[in-house]
A protein has these predicted regions:
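Conserved alpha-helical substructure of the radical SAM core
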Residues: 1-113, 124, 128, 132, ...
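Radical SAM enzyme [4Fe-4S]-AdoMet core and its adjacent flexible, acidic
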Residues: 14, 29-43, 51, 104-194
């Protein structure tokens, strides 16, 4: 940044250390680990982080392990990224708390990409692997993304899919569930991280 005046860092921000799901492959499913992962950044603290770092950020990713939609100031955080001219702002979420209104406000305020965690493309597998998740809410969110992309065609949808023996066969169903709005598919093998 100092020499060329270019942005070069990615900032990965979890504004809250909590999750509404208990996915089988995630550390938030481990009760002991969950007890040690607590806390919420106040918006004022996020503003201080932004003042120190966002002017050098090439990308701001909100949510990188926890569930950012649990933070009451989510849209303000996204807008803060754009206020500092961060070129690319993304949100990683399970999506079950992301209403059409909240998503529309986030995109209007500068959200460039939505990364949705989905570990099954049938109700049975989705709800088994993503404990507390509702497949109907996931499908409703995908319909909302389709609507929002009509107004904001540059808005991107990424699906994060953790592959395991329970869901590998369901990858063939991705197009019937997600449709043509998918821009990026992120695949990774399951691993025990908790």
């Amino acid at each position: 940044f100092h020499v060329l005046g270019k942005r070069y860092i990615g900032i990965f921000l979890d504004p809250v250390l909590a999750c509404n799901f208990r996915c089988k492959m995630c550390y938030f499913s481990d009760e002991q680990k969950r007890k040690s992962l607590r806390g919420t950044l106040k918006y004022e603290e996020i503003e201080a982080i932004a003042g120190s770092l966002f002017h050098r950020a090439l990308k701001l990713q909100v949510g990188c392990g926890a569930e950012p939609t649990l933070h009451k100031d989510l849209v303000k955080i996204i807008a803060l990224g754009k206020r500092y001219n961060v070129p690319y702002v993304s949100l990683t979420t399970n999506g079950n708390l992301l209403t059409k209104e909240l998503l529309a406000a986030a995109v209007k305020n500068g959200l460039d990409e939505l990364t949705l965690s989905a570990h099954g493309f049938t109700r049975e597998t989705y709800e088994y692997l993503m404990t507390n998740g509702k497949f109907d809410l996931f499908c409703k969110l995908l319909a909302n993304v389709t609507e929002i992309k009509k107004q904001y065609p540059q808005f991107k949808l990424r699906i994060n899919y953790t592959i395991n023996n329970n869901n590998i066969e369901e990858l063939s169903r991705i197009w019937e569930v997600v449709g043509d709005e998918l821009d990026i598919l992120q695949l990774r093998p399951i691993q025990k991280i908790g």
